[in-house]
Regions:
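...captures the hydrophobic TM-helix bundle architecture rather than a specific catalytic motif
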Residues: 1-180
């Protein structure tokens, strides 16, 4: 089920995201003055903001993944904004490939987690309900590690790729080819 989760953490993140997004939009008026394709830039930037907002209010991990991918797509579009520059094209491709690799790990982690718990719902994946999931997650193993360990490691891999953490940080310096 799709929905909107408004708890104290998501509300705090909504305030942070909308404040930073507003500042970026305002700053962009001067930064992008005289540039060609300003409407396209604001469309990409707005898609990025919308995706971040959707990510933090998602009620389940699958809905979060949809917005997670939209963040990646809008990042790709923003990095490749100057599509006539070969360096911008190369940078956007590099970011796309590295983050898709990480996102694949994120997706596999989600699928492992949902397979063993039987749900995508955050409410059922919380500590209050962990006793329901722990026996099934601890039961399966691969290469000596439990299903829970694999799921969490793969989820972390996805987060590491999207946030440019080592060793999946290689795309970030090239991302400066887009409007910064």
């Amino acid at each position: 089920d799709m929905g909107v989760l408004l708890d104290p953490i998501s509300v705090m993140m909504l305030v942070v995201i909308t404040t930073v997004s507003l500042m970026v939009h305002i700053y962009s008026f001067g930064y992008m003055k005289g540039e060609r394709g300003v409407q396209r830039y604001y469309a990409f930037l707005s898609l990025f903001s919308f995706s971040m907002l959707g990510l933090v209010v998602a009620t389940n991990i699958f809905q979060m993944y949809i917005f997670w991918e939209l963040v990646g797509a809008s990042s790709y579009l923003l990095i490749g904004f100057y599509y006539t520059k070969p360096a911008a094209i190369a940078a956007s491709k590099k970011a796309f490939i590295v983050t898709r690799f990480a996102d694949l790990g994120f997706l596999i982690g989600i699928l492992i987690l949902s397979f063993y718990t039987g749900t995508f719902d955050f409410g059922l994946l919380t500590a209050d309900n962990a006793s329901l999931a722990v026996p099934s997650l601890a039961g399966g193993s691969f290469l000596g590690l439990s299903a829970a360990t694999w799921a969490m490691a793969l989820l972390f891999m996805g987060a590491a790729g999207k946030s440019a953490m080592f060793p999946l940080h290689i795309w970030l310096p090239d991302a400066m080819e887009g409007p910064t």
